From Swiss-Prot:
Location of cross-link Glycyl lysine isopeptide (Lys-Gly) (interchain with G-Cter in ubiquitin): K170
Originating species: Cavia porcellus (Guinea pig)
Keywords assigned: Acetylation, Cell membrane, Golgi apparatus, GTP-binding, Hydrolase, Isopeptide bond, Lipoprotein, Membrane, Methylation, Nucleotide-binding, Palmitate, Phosphoprotein, Prenylation, Proto-oncogene, Ubl conjugation
Post-translational modification comment from the UniProt entry: Palmitoylated by the ZDHHC9-GOLGA7 complex. Depalmitoylated by ABHD17A, ABHD17B and ABHD17C. A continuous cycle of de- and re-palmitoylation regulates rapid exchange between plasma membrane and Golgi. Acetylation at Lys-104 prevents interaction with guanine nucleotide exchange factors (GEFs).
NCBIfam families xrefs: small_GTP
Record protein name field: GTPase NRas
Modified residues (Phosphoserine): S89
Residue sites binding GTP per the record: 10-18, 29-30, 57-61, 116-119
Subunit architecture: Interacts (active GTP-bound form preferentially) with RGS14. Interacts (active GTP-bound form) with RASSF7. Interacts (active GTP-bound form) with both SHOC2 and PP1c (all isoforms) to form a tertiary complex; SHOC2 and PP1c preferably bind M-Ras/MRAS, but they also bind K-Ras/KRAS, N-Ras/NRAS and H-Ras/HRAS.
């Protein structure tokens, strides 16, 4: 069974824990209890493949920012979450993205931009803005509601697909184009 290490990042109060708990336990937690760090595991089938999702739900609060480098090092893919009713959380996405790229020492890291709380009637972040940001980053954008479960599986599963593509690209990339992953020539039949 293939394991995927997913990390949920974003500002405090955007619904990172609510999204994660909705995926794992199928229920909505409406009271706000700031997370320091929680880890969850769930077995799912995505595109016919049985996967083990190892999900790290992180602290959005600034006082825990020192812990970020550590979990960013171990994560394979990142859900970058903002709340559609919180412009500051949207602006903060770039800070998280830059920190991830710095820690991973790569511009090519699997990520999905997630606009949470789409069930709320008032929004301060326009869908078009979010689509444009995601396009400029070259990553998918998905709107979610941890409350109604809209887009929740889609967000996590899309990230798994991004990680799969990244792994395939790494596996198929080589310096001179003739050597396979074991240092031997590959033959496609």
């Amino acid at each position: 069974m293939t394991e995927y290490k997913l990390v949920v990042v974003g500002a405090g109060g955007v619904g990172k824990s609510a999204l994660t708990i909705q995926l794992i336990q199928n229920h909505f937690v409406d009271e706000y209890d700031p997370t320091i760090e929680d880890s969850y595991r769930k077995q799912v089938v995505i595109d016919g493949e049985t996967c083990l999702l190892d999900i790290l739900d992180t602290a959005g609060q600034e006082e825990y920012s020192a812990m970020r480098d550590q979990y960013m090092r171990t994560g394979e893919g990142f859900l970058c979450v903002f709340a559609i009713n919180n412009s500051k959380s949207f602006a903060d996405i770039n800070l998280y993205r830059e920190q991830i790229k710095r820690v991973k020492d790569s511009d090519d890291v699997p990520m999905v931009l997630v606009g949470n709380k789409c069930d709320l009637p008032t929004r301060t972040v326009d869908t078009k803005q979010a689509h444009e940001l995601a396009k400029s980053y070259g990553i998918p954008f998905i709107e979610t509601s941890a409350k109604t479960r809209q887009g929740v599986e889609d967000a996590f599963y899309t990230l798994v697909r991004e990680i799969r593509q990244y792994r395939m690209k790494k596996l198929n990339s080589n310096d001179d184009g003739t050597q396979g992953c074991m240092g031997l020539p590959c033959v496609v039949m």
